[in-house]
A protein has these predicted regions:
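An exposed, glycine/acidic-rich loop-and-rim segment of catalytic or binding clefts
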Residues: 166, 174-221
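Short, glycine/charge-rich beta-strand/loop segments that flank catalytic centers
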Residues: 114-131, 194-199
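Acidic, His- and aromatic-enriched active-site or binding-groove loops in soluble protein domains
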Residues: 136-156, 220
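C-terminal accessory/tail domains of diverse enzymes
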Residues: 2-6, 18-113, 142, 209-406
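Glycine-biased, low-complexity coil/linker segments
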Residues: 11-13
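Short, low-order "capping/linker" segments at domain edges
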Residues: 128-140, 199-215, 308
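An acidic/histidine-cluster motif and surrounding catalytic segment
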Residues: 160
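Helical (often loop-to-helix) elements that flank the catalytic cores of nucleotide-handling enzymes
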Residues: 99, 136-143, 164-185, 268-281
C-alpha cells in the first residue's frame, strides 16, 4: 500500500496547518507591553444527566455568533471541547475579571444548548474512541499526521502567556523557567482519572500528551538565533508547518512576543487559575530583571528537570523532587520549593499589583489542587459520575458569582 504523506511532512507547502502563523524566520519578535498577560482555557462540554462528554461544539459556537464574547470562543480538536481566550490583560485582577465573564458566558451558552461545562485535565470516564474530530482542515490534517496519538488526545489544558520585550531575554528566561515546571504542574494537576479508572497519578494528562512529538520540556537554547535555527530547520524541511506545532511545556511565541507556559492541566476553580497566573507572571518578571542586570540565569540539565516534572505528575503537591537550586542530596517536597519561590517573587508581585492574587498559591498548598479535590469526592462514595458533577459545579461557580455581581 502506498503511504500518502500530508504536505507538511513532504515539505511541499504547509498543507493548511498553522494557518495565520508565519515562519519563525519571517518576522521579528512581537512587541507587547512587558509582563502583560493572556490565558487560554479548554473546557469539557457535558451532558447534565449522564455527565459524559457531548459533541456540541458546533451548536454552542453557532449560538455564540452574535454574542459579545464570540471572538473569544473557539473549537478544539474534539467536538466535545471548547476553548476560551482572554484579551490582553495587564494584571492578574484583569485575568480574574475576564475569565469570570467568559466562564459565565460559556456556561450560559452551554445551558442554552442543553449541556454544561467543566474544567479539569481529563474527563474522569469518557472514552476518546467515542469522540468526533472537529471538521476543520487543521484538525483533519493533524490526525492524518499523528494518527492514534492525536485521536486519543482527550485532554484539557490551561496556557498562560506573559509578554517579554526582547527575544534574547525571552530565551534566557525560558531556560530559567524550566526548573519551575514541576511547581506549575503540581499546583494545577487535576487529572487523576483516565477512562474511568484512578491512575495513581496527579496528572494523567501529562502521560497522554507525552506521546506527542516535540512535547515535554524544551532543550536549553544558547540564544534566540539558536532557537530560530533549530525551528527553522524543522520548517524548511517540512517536518512542521510553523512553530506552533512545537508543543513544549513552555515555549516562546514569536508572533505574540510572549513566553507561553503550557504544562498546566486545565484548572477547575477560577481563583486557582488566577493565582497560578500571578505566580507565573511574577517569576517571569524576576528572571527578566535578573537578565537585565547582567547576571546569568541558572539552568540545569534537561534530564533533571524532566525527572522533577515526572515526580510532580505522579505525586502532585506531595511530590518529593530534587532541589536543583541548592544541590542538596535529599529530595524535598515540591510544596516547600513553591513556598521558597513565593518568597523570591513577592516583591515583583507587589510591583505588578498582584500580591493579593499571589496569596491564592498558598491557599492551593493548604487545601490541595484539583486532583486532590477529585480524589476526595471519589473516596467518599466511589461514584465517578459525582466527580464530574463536582467539577462542573466548581467550574460554573464563576458564572454564579458573575451573575450575582450584575
Amino acid at each position: 500500500m502506498k503511504q500518502i504523506f500530508p504536505p507538511s511532512i513532504t515539505g511541499k507547502g504547509s498543507g493548511g496547518l498553522g494557518s495565520g502563523h508565519a515562519s519563525v524566520l519571517d518576522h521579528s519578535f512581537g512587541k507587547s507591553d512587558p509582563y502583560t498577560l493572556g490565558v487560554e482555557e479548554e473546557y469539557m462540554l457535558l451532558d447534565p444527566e449522564t455527565w459524559d462528554l457531548v459533541q456540541h461544539i458546533d451548536s454552542v459556537l453557532a449560538a455564540a455568533e452574535d454574542g459579545e464574547h464570540h471572538e473569544r470562543i473557539h473549537a478544539e480538536l474534539m467536538q466535545s471541547v471548547l476553548e476560551v481566550t482572554t484579551p490582553v490583560c495587564r494584571t492578574a485582577a484583569d485575568v480574574m475579571r475576564s475569565l469570570s465573564q467568559l466562564r459565565s458566558y460559556v456556561a450560559e451558552l452551554a445551558r442554552s444548548e442543553g449541556c454544561r461545562v467543566g474544567s479539569a485535565g481529563t474527563h474522569p470516564f469518557s472514552l476518546f474512541e467515542r469522540q468526533r474530530i472537529t471538521a476543520r482542515d487543521r484538525y483533519r490534517q493533524l490526525v492524518d499526521q499523528l494518527q492514534y496519538i492525536a485521536r486519543r488526545e482527550l485532554i484539557f489544558g490551561m496556557h498562560m502567556h506573559v509578554a517579554v520585550d526582547d527575544p534574547e531575554k525571552a530565551i534566557q528566561v525560558m531556560n530559567g523557567l524550566l526548573v519551575h515546571l514541576p511547581q506549575m504542574l503540581a499546583l494545577s494537576a487535576s487529572s487523576p482519572f483516565w477512562r474511568g479508572e484512578p491512575t495513581g497519578l496527579a496528572s494523567s494528562r501529562q502521560m497522554v500528551f507525552a506521546a506527542f512529538p516535540r512535547s515535554g520540556p524544551p532543550p536549553r537554547f544558547k540564544d534566540y538565533a539558536d532557537y530560530a535555527e533549530v525551528v527553522g530547520q524543522l520548517e524548511r524541511t517540512g517536518c512542521i508547518a510553523d512553530y506552533t506545532h512545537i508543543w513544549w511545556d513552555i515555549r516562546p511565541h514569536p508572533r505574540l512576543g510572549t513566553i507561553e507556559m503550557r504544562v498546566c492541566d486545565a484548572v477547575t476553580r477560577l481563583e486557582d487559575v488566577v493565582a497560578i497566573t500571578a505566580f507565573f507572571q511574577a517569576i517571569v518578571k524576576m528572571y527578566c530583571e535578573l537578565h537585565e542586570s547582567g547576571k546569568e540565569i541558572p539552568t540545569w540539565h534537561r534530564l533533571l528537570t524532566t525527572e522533577n516534572k515526572w515526580l510532580a505528575a505522579r505525586y502532585g503537591l506531595e511530590a518529593p523532587i530534587m532541589d536543583l537550586a541548592t544541590g542538596r542530596r535529599n529530595r524535598v517536597p515540591v510544596a516547600q520549593l513553591v513556598r521558597r519561590t513565593l518568597r523570591d517573587v513577592e516583591p515583583h508581585a507587589r510591583e505588578l499589583g498582584s500580591e493579593r492574587e499571589l496569596e491564592g498559591v498558598r491557599e492551593i498548598l493548604a487545601r490541595g489542587n484539583g486532583s486532590d479535590r477529585q480524589l476526595r469526592v471519589w473516596n467518599a462514595n466511589r461514584d465517578i459520575v459525582e466527580v464530574v458533577r463536582e467539577i462542573s459545579i466548581a467550574t460554573e461557580a464563576a458564572a454564579v458569582s458573575e451573575s450575582a455581581a450584575n
